Amino acid sequence: YILEIPRLEDDKRYLLVNILNLKTEMVLSKGTKNKDNGAGKYIILYRDEKVPEGYEDYIPIRSEDSRNYFIIRLESYGENDYGKANAIQDQFVMRALYPERIVERESLPDGYNGQSYFMTQMKPAEFIRRLQGTIADTRHDETMLTYMRQLRLLDPAFSYEELPEHLQKEIASGFEDGLQAILQYSGTEGYESNGWHAYIDSVGEYGRKYRYRAHINYFAVMPNLYSDTISPNLETDSDGNV
């Protein structure tokens, strides 16, 4: 897969581009913490696959897993900035290296569990631990820090078991809701915009109440480097609407 990240003129605008494998290990992380906002041309290859002819000027990134998550978060400064933020978004390029191999589907194949596998493995306690690990990325935003402060997540020693019982239940039910939404997804709700495939669905009560998306354009897709297929994941707009 090809990923081209544009250079941002505004170096204060938050940008995070992550590629994670199916075990959520980091394959690539670029953004405002990197030189030139991580701008550049990248080619994501499966294991020891050779860089194809004509792509020698691309930076090779290798993944041990065939299925990977591509996630982009781009900050906007409110409604008056949406036009500029969307124009930046349109400069991103993500496309299959061999698009002629891709066969379009009206729905996901029977037995598909690409996303649900990880959700059934990750427990709520692990979710809280990972959420605590995002503090460094959200220190610039007082809204998110306020949420985390209310949940006592700024204390690295704090654990899921110490949350009030009603919050533990909301998190657990949110996991179940999210899993069922994935398992019941027909594929017909999908759409394509500038090469990004997405779908719209419920993320559960916990996700609706506590998931931080305000003023962040959020895109995620799951391409398969081995079979040249792509599965829909999630998209939100700058107001956090899924």
Predicted regions and their residues:
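A compositional/structural signature for long, glycine/proline-rich flexible linkers
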Residues: 1-242
